[in-house]
Amino acid sequence: MTAPPETAPTDAELLAASVRDGDRFTAVYDRHYAGVHRYVAGRLGPQAADDVVAETFLTAFRRRAAFDPSRGDVRPWLFGIATNLIAQHRRTETRRYRVLAKVGADRDPGGHDDRVAASVSAERLQPSLARALAALSRKDRDVVLLKALAQLTHEEIADVLGIPYGTVGSRLSRARRKLRAALPAPTEGL
């Protein structure tokens, strides 16, 4: 008989092990860095994201002994730390949305193929979307961006923000309704 295959340790197990051996935290970092970075970059822009993500993982490392797995998983805990740090950088985020609403997003100076591949309708929509996001309340914007950028589940968003599961659905529904009302209707053929 062969032994059953070993399963990879869970995030909570790695975090607990990292209390005794700090090097074990590297696995948590490796598993979640890209997702946290994508979320923060979408909120604050790529330049601020590097600093905020570094601060997120430094905070998580410092608080790893206090992590309580009975209150939720490591992934939403990390996104909660990131969301709290984003709140400290909120003025930058709001300014960014206002600038995007006025001038559109920075154009990627990529090659000709990249420019051709860019969707005309997305380019046209970006200032309107930025304006609509800036108009949402902070609470509604947090839920929308945790869903859209971090791709968290309703349950994970509830854990991150410390709100009931049903409130996530209510805020998301309200925010989507406001965004739909604020955005131009899709145009046929684009």
Where are these regions (language model features)?
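Arg/Lys-rich amphipathic alpha helix in sigma70-family domain 2
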Residues: 62-69, 80-102, 114, 122
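Short amphipathic alpha-helical boundary/capping segments
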Residues: 13-16, 128-136, 182
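Short, Lys/Arg-enriched C-terminal cap helix and immediately downstream tail that follows
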Residues: 91-94, 141, 176-190
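Helix-turn-helix DNA-binding module
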Residues: 130-145, 150-167, 178
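Acidic, proline/glycine-rich intrinsically disordered inter-domain spacer in sigma factors
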Residues: 2, 106-134
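Structural recognition of an alpha-helix C-terminal capping motif at a helix-to-coil junction
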Residues: 51-58, 62, 72-84
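Short, charged helix-capping/linker segments at alpha-helix termini
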Residues: 2-4, 19-27, 37-55, 189-190
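Residues within the DNA-recognition helix of helix-turn-helix
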Residues: 32, 128, 171-174, 178
